[in-house]
From Swiss-Prot:
One of its GO terms (molecular function) is GTPase activator activity. It comes from the Eukaryota. The keyword Metal-binding applies. This is Sporulation protein SPS18. The lineage of its organism: Eukaryota, Fungi, Dikarya, Ascomycota, Saccharomycotina.
């Protein structure tokens, strides 16, 4: 097993040395010194030992550095170097207005354009189908930035570099057709299409939750039970609201509007009238209820 690993590493080193013989790769990408011995697995470029020490300080998530002679390489790392190279990455930076000299290293390699280059390079290594108009800095990016001055471009580059962490996984798609009246018409139609699609989705959800069958329960018992519980909860809540609106609130309002002292007086008057209609009851009964103030004349 060890022999197989050594042979694989030797084969990878041979491939890297062959890629190093290509035009532009025999010089350090940063300082242009001859015979670089390190490569960047992130961008697929060759760099010298001094520049490797500087770039390694930015972190492996931004700039991964490996030695050709001392480190082991995976297949994807070697393919990145073979597909990229110094000239291709340098032309990419020039096309996007990023100067190769005179700017800080972090601003050069940790920005939106560099991340776009790394994503496209990784997709090419995975042999995915790539739309060449999909990523910033390739082919038709120049028509997208016509009329922009270099000063505005540099300021924008610094701003998006500072905010790049918030949009780490975002993909940037360029328009496939020239901006014009057709695109503005598409923008006007977009809200209506979005609204119709949203209404269609809501109708589908409502119809799906309102019909519960045995087949659905067998296919998805947990989902069916959860939807049933949701329907039951909605029905109970609606019944509670109806009961509260038709019984509880009118009763409370009726109690608040009634004049209790007058009701008590009317009750005592009615009770007194009943006492006068029954004169044969003994005196303690009346004194118990009335205190002796409203006894009929027969008991005085």
């Amino acid at each position: 097993m060890r022999l197989f690993e050594n042979s694989k590493d030797m084969e990878n080193r041979k491939r890297l040395l062959r890629a190093k013989k290509a035009a532009g790769n025999n010089n350090c990408f940063e300082c242009k010194s001859v015979n670089p011995q390190f490569v960047s697995c992130s961008f697929g470029i060759f760099i010298c030992v001094n520049c490797a020490n500087l770039l390694r300080g930015m972190g492996t998530n931004i700039f991964c550095v490996k030695s050709i002679t001392m480190d082991n390489f995976e297949e994807k790392d070697v393919r990145r170097v073979e597909k990229s190279g110094n000239n291709r990455f340098g032309s990419f930076l020039s096309k996007n207005g990023i100067l190769q000299n005179g700017i800080p290293l972090r601003e050069k390699y940790d920005n939106l354009f560099a991340k776009s280059y790394k994503r496209r390079l990784a997709n090419e290594v995975r042999s995915n189908d790539i739309n060449r108009n999909m990523y910033l800095g390739f082919n038709n990016f120049q028509q997208y930035t016509n009329g922009a001055t270099s000063q505005i471009r540099d300021r924008t580059l610094r701003e998006i570099s500072n905010n790049s962490n918030a949009s780490e996984g975002a993909e940037f798609v360029l328009p496939e057709k020239v901006l014009g009246s057709d695109n503005f018409q598409d923008c006007e139609r977009f809200p209506a299409c979005l609204s119709s699609e949203r209404n269609l989705d809501e109708n589908n959800v409502t119809s799906a939750t309102s019909t519960l069958t045995i087949e659905k329960f067998q296919n998805d018992p947990i989902g069916t039970i959860s939807r049933s519980w949701q329907l039951l909860s909605d029905a109970l809540y609606k019944s509670y609201e109806d009961f509260k609106g038709s019984v509880v609130q009118p009763t409370i309002e009726n109690i608040q509007q009634r004049n209790l002292p007058n009701d008590i007086k009317r009750s005592f008057v009615h009770f007194n009238e009943k006492l006068h209609e029954t004169p044969h009851l003994p005196s303690p009964v009346f004194s118990c209820f009335t205190g002796g103030d409203i006894l009929p004349p027969e008991f005085n």
